[in-house]
């Protein structure tokens, strides 16, 4: 057992440092092509690259381990100190992805066919997960790899609506203007704004506003973007109509949308992950997340899904991303135990 653990940790160290050295912000996933070709050859896992998103698919089977290879922008030089690995994506989500790749390799060596994906664009519009749903893939089970502290099983994510609003007005000299598009729209923003308070209450948050071209002329056009988040028990159409009613004189366009997801605690993946953690004397927690993940998308191609992964979720998107080799090992072990149970029951 100890020998296996040291083997996994050594391989995880090698692979994660290699992958962290490759800068893969969203839309730049092709930078990792040689890495996945090497993995395919070394671990005898068939490699497929989805053409539209440049997502990487390794192996075959009806069980999918799905993580993502893209990161938020900002390269961080990878390093290791006392079995702690630092670098952009160490937590979100190259650490979970490496755990999944190693688990898939070891499972396939045992004759348990598992597919693992390094999806593209999760940090943007999830075009990798969306392309996967269009490729006629159907999986009995999917485990999504995101940092969940190595103990948490995510059973619910909120949905999101990304709204562009374009407003126009007659420009006037600022010294004598009778109206001002910035002032008028600012009042409406304040009226429609819903601050993120708790999971069950929707949020409507302005994130971008652009207007004006001259110091002394009121703007003729204004661009505004809202990031709307809502739980599965909130009414999507009511939120959109509320914004439409407030901005009746402006144009409104939904530029991206992700449906919320919620799975039962009796879901096979949830139960198998729970038992996998208990077998390691780790107390599992079922949690829900205020953001979104590829789980929101991938729910379309399976009836059995949940999210789990190693890594401190509080470090996501920060310049302090780090993960320990022990965390990665627990991730590998948990994925393997869960999939072995799912495989036996299939």
Curated annotation (Swiss-Prot):
Q: Recite the UniProt cofactor note for this protein.
A: Binds 2 Zn(2+) or Co(2+) ions per subunit.
Reactions it catalyzes = [amino-group carrier protein]-C-terminal-gamma-(L-lysyl)-L-glutamate + H2O = [amino-group carrier protein]-C-terminal-L-glutamate + L-lysine; [amino-group carrier protein]-C-terminal-gamma-(L-ornithyl)-L-glutamate + H2O = [amino-group carrier protein]-C-terminal-L-glutamate + L-ornithine
The entry's Zn(2+) 2-binding residues are 92, 123, 317
Q: Which BP terms from GO are recorded?
A: arginine biosynthetic process via ornithine; L-arginine biosynthetic process; lysine biosynthetic process via aminoadipic acid
Q: Name one Pfam family in it.
A: Peptidase_M20
Compartments annotated for it: namely:
Cytoplasm
Q: Tell me the protein's name.
A: [LysW]-lysine/[LysW]-ornithine hydrolase
Quote the gene name from the UniProt entry. Answer: lysK
